């Protein structure tokens, strides 16, 4: 959680003021007048839930941090000489220090409980696909791509296997990419020379799943692919003939049932 505030002030109030200033006509990109930006960033750090919590408040002037408050130390520290007078003054304000020390509970732990259900506990299972980067004959250098998309949180482990043996050499990754909707994606690629009969497996482990998710890609020769396509084509053609035959049969049956038997006329 990050917010803006000044010593003794409210995070929300300071954030509102900052947004108002930045959205005013004076903050337009075409304005060439010199601007000076004062920031205060509140950071709540958590370890094992709320078992270990510390609060860090950083004071920044024109992108340079000059002072900070660390709840582990319970006092303000000067980062540069510019911040020394401020740190000394704030440390002399006992009521301010007491409020800062209490914020570990009143601000950090409290807000953890508010957002935990849709942040810390949020789980979205990844979607995994495997494909070669280029369509070319076997026994040529290729790049197998394992696309892992739409998962949350960002902690994930992706491994490549060839015929059941893990491949570590030739594995490259794009790293985590944010999708902008609180999910992530990554591409993990394996440089290899596929040979007929080999089976490549991308294995994904993620907190949203109880067990690893595996997706396989099999290397097939051109003749094997041709046979498979021929088989599929023959199967589809057979279905067409079967459908046509059934259609003709049922149409003929309907025609016969519509004929009135002879000898029943009066």
From Swiss-Prot:
Region (Beta-2): 125-227
Annotated GO CC locations: clathrin-coated endocytic vesicle membrane; endocytic vesicle membrane; ER to Golgi transport vesicle membrane; Golgi membrane; late endosome membrane; lumenal side of endoplasmic reticulum membrane; lysosomal membrane; MHC class II protein complex
Protein's GO biological process: adaptive immune response; antigen processing and presentation of exogenous peptide antigen via MHC class II; peptide antigen assembly with MHC class II protein complex; positive regulation of immune response; positive regulation of T cell activation
Keyword annotations: Adaptive immunity, Cell membrane, Disulfide bond, Endoplasmic reticulum, Endosome, Glycoprotein, Golgi apparatus, Immunity, Isopeptide bond, Lysosome, Membrane, MHC II, Signal, Transmembrane, Transmembrane helix, Ubl conjugation
Outcome of mutating residue 141 to Y: In allele DRB4*01:06
Segment forming the signal sequence: 1-29
Molecular function as annotated in GO: MHC class II protein complex binding; peptide antigen binding
Compartmental location: Cell membrane; Endoplasmic reticulum membrane; Golgi apparatus, trans-Golgi network membrane; Endosome membrane
Sequence ranges on the Extracellular membrane side: 30-227
Ig-like C1-type domain boundaries: 126-216
Positions of transmembrane segments: 228-250
Superkingdom of origin organism: Eukaryota
Residue numbers on the Cytoplasmic membrane side: 251-266
Start and end residues of each stretch annotated as Beta-1: 30-124
CDD domains tied to this protein: IgC1_MHC_II_beta_HLA-DR
Pfam family, one: C1-set
Family classification: Belongs to the MHC class II family.
Functional description taken from the UniProt entry: Binds peptides derived from antigens that access the endocytic route of antigen presenting cells (APC) and presents them on the cell surface for recognition by the CD4 T-cells. The peptide binding cleft accommodates peptides of 10-30 residues. The peptides presented by MHC class II molecules are generated mostly by degradation of proteins that access the endocytic route, where they are processed by lysosomal proteases and other hydrolases.
Subunit structure: Heterodimer of an alpha and a beta subunit; also referred as MHC class II molecule. In the endoplasmic reticulum (ER) it forms a heterononamer; 3 MHC class II molecules bind to a CD74 homotrimer (also known as invariant chain or HLA class II histocompatibility antigen gamma chain). In the endosomal/lysosomal system; CD74 undergoes sequential degradation by various proteases; leaving a small fragment termed CLIP on each MHC class II molecule. MHC class II molecule interacts with HLA_DM, and HLA_DO in B-cells, in order to release CLIP and facilitate the binding of antigenic peptides.
Protein name: HLA class II histocompatibility antigen, DR beta 4 chain
Organism: Homo sapiens
Gene that encodes it: HLA-DRB4
